[in-house]
Amino acid sequence: MDRIPVSKKDTGMRSICVFFQHMWQQLNLNSLEIPLKEVYSFMGYNDSEPDEQTRRTVEYLLRECAQFLRPQFKYVIVDGTLDLEQNQLTLIGEKGPVTFDAGKIICRQLRGAQRYAVFVATVGNGYFQWTDAVKRRDDMFQTYAMDCVGSQIVESVADYMETVLQKEIDPSGFKRTNRFSPGYCGWHVSAQPALFSLFTEKNPCGIELTESCLMLPMKSVSGIIGVGPDVRYLPYTCGICNKKDCYKRR
């Protein structure tokens, strides 16, 4: 964990500055809460119970994946300014300012933030070996279930990351917003390269970006979280977003 150097202009933020700038952790799967209900939801079981075969398959895959996956996350805290008229967010990284057309929904949700956590989370590069092992069995259902298990694991990694972030900012009386990612809530996925540029390394947590801004391993997430004494953490409000295929939509 690297600390933020405090300059004179930062003295009003000293209580948060002394805690961190970068945070990276690799996790053991046993430290993660992976709700089976959420895995089944990814599989389409929103209002119904999965059958016995589905339950056995998911439980087997959760045991098996521990051999392959090395979940990890990283976040960096940066200064930034929010322009609610232009619906833009400018973040100040080590290489200079980066401006995002984050859209009305996200900018409104970030109101009150004094700083911003830029994050990535992933199941790790072992996901490639795990998918190869499962696909060699030539079992389409197991391959589908594996994809859903991976989706929930990376969500659990991001959830865990949020608890770590909150513990770091608690002594300052800071709260956090929801996490927001390029590709959702009106923020175009093409913002990914600019977001990644805010990290010191090209491939944080070993995540690579393709030319189409797809993250590899695919079971990876990135985004921002606002922090400050006046921000709010709200349930995901699907009614104000027009993305019909969002994974958070219920």
Name every feature range the model reports, one short phrase each.
Residues 19-143, 232:
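Active-site helix-to-loop segments that bind/position phosphate- or nucleotide-bearing substrates
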